[in-house]
Amino acid sequence: MNTSRLFSLLFQGSLVKRIAAGLVLGIVVALISAPLQETIGFNLAEKVGVLGTIFVKALRAVAPILIFFLVMAALANRKIGTKSNMKEIIVLYLLGTFLAAFVAVIAGFVFPTEVVLAAKEDSSSAPQAVGQVLLTLILNVVDNPLNAIFKANFIGVLAWSIGLGLALRHASDATKNVLSDFAEGVSKIVHVIISFAPFGVFGLVAETLSDKGLVALGGYVQLLAVLIGTMLFTAFVVNPILVYWKIRRNPYPLVWTCVRESGVTAFFTRSSAANIPVNIELAKRLNLDEETYSVSIPLGANINMAGAAITITILTLAAVHTLGLEVSFVSALLLSIVAALCACGASGVAGGSLLLIPLACSLFGISDDVAAQMIGVGFIIGILQDSTETALNSSTDVLFTAAVCMEEERKNAA
């Protein structure tokens, strides 16, 4: 493929092809920026990295407003007595997280990994106990709605949008139409932002690879292999089984669509919250029920944490093996599940699951000092770990939503 053809893909053709072109160009720029720096006097990758910063900033800026109006409009316009699929979707979210943790525990014991602990990282913002995490979650729910939108507190935004949406179900049709128009207007803005995804990916890839490179990951190859291998197993074995249970047909076309169109973008933005607009656009193209996906996808970004369950479990067990501690399989599973479920308090933040490592480690009696160093390990491998984790988390949001919607269609057609 010549250069002109590669550049043309950034401006026309399918979004997936354009993102792929941006990925290739980003890698090329990252590789040539260092040799060119002496000649041109600046690091080219750092300069184009601003494109990625702008793209992620735009997604994060629009996401709270999109959630607020979309969820509120969907609930306000829902007819009283209408059947909801949310219970089935939430069950899938929780079951998927549980099975991800289960697979991670198995992988952690089958492939025991020891690491050379890095220098201390600041973990002062990490929760110290389950009670503290739950308290933070409750405080986020009752946050001021304007403050929640300004600070992108997605738990608070979701709580207020659900509350107002339910309260406005008895409002006049004119009021409901205004809410729908606002939701549609924000959705159009989202569509414009997503069309710039290839440029965002180009900037993100160029800057990230130029800054850290793949050499930094060399000392943690086994840990990365276990982490990413477990996530891939969950994405392409565990999740398809759950989807088949719902739709009763070959799940892989749907799985691949969600991974390709949601997971790829989430891999580079490294934020489930920033990927919410992408998932909503995909749900529209899949012709899913808007009243369902407008609520389930933002909710999934906060509670569907399969990738976080894997990260917390694998890294905690790595600390256990490094220290030579003896922990029973059942204890490891139960304690890791508790930590993974509490991870919803750190959702929507790139690398947020790493802050839950001290919580999981404390359940095994591991000191805060060691736990803080494990956070440092997480940051070192974060270039791949956090990206893969977010891709799994976010693509699963739309995957499970689609599975439940398709199950409903199958039952109605029967």
Swiss-Prot record:
The protein, known as: Serine/threonine transporter SstT
Name of the gene this protein is made from: sstT
A Pfam short name: SDF
Reactions performed catalytically: L-serine(in) + Na(+)(in) = L-serine(out) + Na(+)(out); L-threonine(in) + Na(+)(in) = L-threonine(out) + Na(+)(out)
Species of origin: Haemophilus influenzae (strain PittGG)
Gene Ontology CC: plasma membrane
Compartments in which it is found: Cell inner membrane
Cross-referenced InterPro entries: Na-dicarboxylate_symporter, Na:dicarbo_symporter_sf, Ser_Thr_transp_SstT
Residue spans crossing the bilayer: 22-42, 54-74, 89-109, 148-168, 189-209, 223-243, 305-325, 337-357
Keywords: Amino-acid transport, Cell inner membrane, Cell membrane, Membrane, Symport, Transmembrane, Transmembrane helix, Transport
Family: Belongs to the dicarboxylate/amino acid:cation symporter (DAACS) (TC 2.A.23) family.
Membrane topology: Multi-pass membrane protein
Taxonomic lineage from the root: Bacteria, Pseudomonadati, Pseudomonadota, Gammaproteobacteria, Pasteurellales
Functional description taken from the UniProt entry: Involved in the import of serine and threonine into the cell, with the concomitant import of sodium (symport system).
GO process terms (BP): serine transport; threonine transport
